[in-house]
């Protein structure tokens, strides 16, 4: 039975299915018989959150413990948020409909910097104080994890616990400490946090003090409790085969952004693209065995009824057993009307065999990341792709019957000139011309080449963390020049808004002094900042001004190679010396080969107890 207030709210919103729960695959337990209740919160809409594979992994993992219950909560859309505030309806979980205050721990995934005000909105709707210092042991522990945890400093004051790295061992260890403390009784919040701080990869922001130089730079980040490490090393799963992919998903009532079965085939990446934060955060690369993946995929499709299976990773075509895996999948997938998709294909190892094995049921779109329009700039960013490889790949795709290709690029990259921008248009035009030069192309069919151009945002833990971000004026000028450089109606251009990218850059490299700004901006009506129709750029800029903070200080200035950064106390395996070396190679337009061909000494090897190449010897 729904609460009468909830029933009233559901009758007044556009998509009530976002908020009802009861989806196939949901886990229900007797809350009186469980020892730990964990609310997994995704700070965006239901449709976006239900596309997130990480939630599915941890949902199944935590619920595999008989005496723990993991439930889900999402950020309500504007209409539901207004109804909940009008009716005094607190934010609740999808399974039990209990408010977040009824849980032992409330966990947020940090996937995107522009979700930070949504986190405050969810805490506000739940009636939970924003700041960790204002919550004692009677409140749920507020936990964060995910890629943005690598510099959680702008929101560190809101969280009790921040997980660095991979959560499969880490999160159950946190829940185990919560369970132990509850059974003991009388354990203070500080004592519980001291225990949790001993778990590998756990960062307790309250146990660190930050001091600043007169010019605003970070001076030092130091522990303020005995036994707390000066640097926190990320948690890592050494052998992914020890954690089989989920074989059941909660199937959404309302179509998710990515509504399909998905299995993670590998983690990490060997490529070393200098702009790619994920490629550095998840080093070294580890893969699952083809036999394990095939069994998990078959069970997942059977349990959920999905007819599309995505082989997910940062670079799926680098899996050493990919051809074998596709052969195994194609033994059963066509019979079950399941199509296969590879969302992260590489231009330089795409083959006719690969395309044949992924189009036996129906064709899905092809997207390739060229990233830059000239070879010089591709060398700068270490995107080891040439025009010959792009030409070969598109030829294979067009001969196989494809008539649409999307090419991903970035603008605002280090050392970029207008010549590089023109190169984007020239590359797209060469793809169009290639299509019409092929005798095997589909007769009577035209080609569509889409340029998707993101604004480059320098991120922590990458060789480009030192570089300033382009100003909005510079990015808009480059966007205008790109549009003027495209002359074919066969080419469509999409590009990101430079103002949202600017705010993303501010939070990506920000520090704890931004927390009050985020709170004030939320109070002034800023949330869903990643949504164009909701983003209030002027409100943000006025808030920064009123609070005496210059946002450009964080993202539009060069960081010294020996400067203490807000994330200096976070160790993701790759050494500072390696990042500096790669930065200098970038300025010289020198490339670094993938690390499955040779170890370059990035430092991530110590996380596995041996050289990286020992763990990737079968990756070719």
Where are these regions (language model features)?
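Radical SAM enzyme core and accessory elements
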Residues: 1-27, 38-40, 487-620
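N-terminal [4Fe-4S]-dependent radical SAM core
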Residues: 7-39, 46-47, 205, 211, ...
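N-terminal pre-triad scaffold of radical SAM enzymes
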Residues: 38-44, 62, 250-277, 301, ...
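Conserved SAM/AdoMet-binding glycine-rich loop
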Residues: 40-41, 45, 114, 299-406, ...
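Canonical Radical SAM [4Fe-4S] cluster-binding loop centered on the CxxxCxxC motif
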Residues: 52, 255-291, 601-619
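A short beta-strand-loop structural module common to alpha/beta enzyme folds
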Residues: 67-79
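Glycine-rich beta-alpha loop elements in corrinoid/cobalamin-binding modules
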Residues: 76-223, 463-511, 519-533
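Flexible glycine/acidic-rich beta-alpha junction loops that bind and position SAM and/or redox cofactors
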Residues: 78-79, 154, 209-213, 320, ...
């Amino acid at each position: 039975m729904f609460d009468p207030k909830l029933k009233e709210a559901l009758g007044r919103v556009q998509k009530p299915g976002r908020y009802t729960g009861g989806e196939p695959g949901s886990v229900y337990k007797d809350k009186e018989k469980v020892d730990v209740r964990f609310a997994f919160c995704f700070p965006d809409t239901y449709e976006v959150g239900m596309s997130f594979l990480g939630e599915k992994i941890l949902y199944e993992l935590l619920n595999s413990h008989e005496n723990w219950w993991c439930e889900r909560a999402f950020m309500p859309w504007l209409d539901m948020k207004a109804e909940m505030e009008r009716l005094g309806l607190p934010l609740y979980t999808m399974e039990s409909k209990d408010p977040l205050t009824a849980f032992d721990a409330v966990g947020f995934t940090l996937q995107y910097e522009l979700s930070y005000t949504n986190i405050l909105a969810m805490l506000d709707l739940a009636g939970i104080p924003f700041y960790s210092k204002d919550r004692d042991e009677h409140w749920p522990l507020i936990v964060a994890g995910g890629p943005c945890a690598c510099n959680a400093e702008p929101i560190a004051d809101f969280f009790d616990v921040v997980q660095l790295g991979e959560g499969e061992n880490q999160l159950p260890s946190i829940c185990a400490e919560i369970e132990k403390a509850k059974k003991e009784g009388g354990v203070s919040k500080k004592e519980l946090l001291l225990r949790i701080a001993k778990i590998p990869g756990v960062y307790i922001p309250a146990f660190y003090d930050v001091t600043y130089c007169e010019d605003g730079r970070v001076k030092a980040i130091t522990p303020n409790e005995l036994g707390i490490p000066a640097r926190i090393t990320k948690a890592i799963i050494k052998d992914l085969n020890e954690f089989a992919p989920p074989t059941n998903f909660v199937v959404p009532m309302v179509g998710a952004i990515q509504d399909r079965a998905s299995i993670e085939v590998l983690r990490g990446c060997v490529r070393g693209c200098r702009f790619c934060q994920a490629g550095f955060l998840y080093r070294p690369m580890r893969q699952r065995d083809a036999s394990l993946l095939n069994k998990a995929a078959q069970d997942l499709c059977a349990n959920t009824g999905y007819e599309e299976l995505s082989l997910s990773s940062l670079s799926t075509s680098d899996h050493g057993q990919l051809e074998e895996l596709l052969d195994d999948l194609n033994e059963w997938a066509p019979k079950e009307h399941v199509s296969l998709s590879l969302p992260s294909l590489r231009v330089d190892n795409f083959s006719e065999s690969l395309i044949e094995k992924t189009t036996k049921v129906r064709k899905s779109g092809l997207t390739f990341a060229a990233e830059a329009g000239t070879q010089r700039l591709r060398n700068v960013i270490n995107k080891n792709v040439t025009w010959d490889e792009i030409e070969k790949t598109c030829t294979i795709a067009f001969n196989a019957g494809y008539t649409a290709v999307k090419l991903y690029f970035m603008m605002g990259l280090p050392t970029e000139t207008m010549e590089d921008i023109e190169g984007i248009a020239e590359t797209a035009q060469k793809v169009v011309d290639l299509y019409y030069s092929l005798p095997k192309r589909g007769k009577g069919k035209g080609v569509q080449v889409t340029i998707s151009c993101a604004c480059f945002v320098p991120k922590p833990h990458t060789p480009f963390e030192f570089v300033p971000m382009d100003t909005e004026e510079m990015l808009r000028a480059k966007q205008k020049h790109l549009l003027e450089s495209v002359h074919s109606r066969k080419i469509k251009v999409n590009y990101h808004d430079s103002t949202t990218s600017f705010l993303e850059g501010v939070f990506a490299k920000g520090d704890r002094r931004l927390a009050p700004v985020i709170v004030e901006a939320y109070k002034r009506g800023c949330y869903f900042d990643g949504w164009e129709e909701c983003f209030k750029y002027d409100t943000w800029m006025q808030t920064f001004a009123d609070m005496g903070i210059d946002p450009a200080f964080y993202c539009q200035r060069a960081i010294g190679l020996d400067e203490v950064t807000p994330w200096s106390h976070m160790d993701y395996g790759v050494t500072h010396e390696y990042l500096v070396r790669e930065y200098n190679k970038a300025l010289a337009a020198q490339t670094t080969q993938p690390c499955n061909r040779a170890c370059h000494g990035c430092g991530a090897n110590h996380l596995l107890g041996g050289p990286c190449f020992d763990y990737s010897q079968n990756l070719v």
